[in-house]
Amino acid sequence: PDRIVVLPGYPAVFVELKTITGRLTSLQRVQLKRLKDMGQAVRVLHGEHEVKLFLEECKEKLRDGV
């Protein structure tokens, strides 16, 4: 993953960033599946819009607190 997002009181999220038309490589698919199989939160975000939406989700969690 490109980023690991850690917020207080929430599980870590492994984030893969792609362009709008970007695709996961076969190795990325394998690694993300391994993380999911271990019960980890995994997100693949395509383009700036999805990144902004994800950041808004994070901000909401921080505002709501634990």
Model features per residue range: what roles?
Residues 1-66:
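Catalytic phosphate/metal-binding cores of nucleic-acid and nucleotide-processing enzymes, i.e., regions
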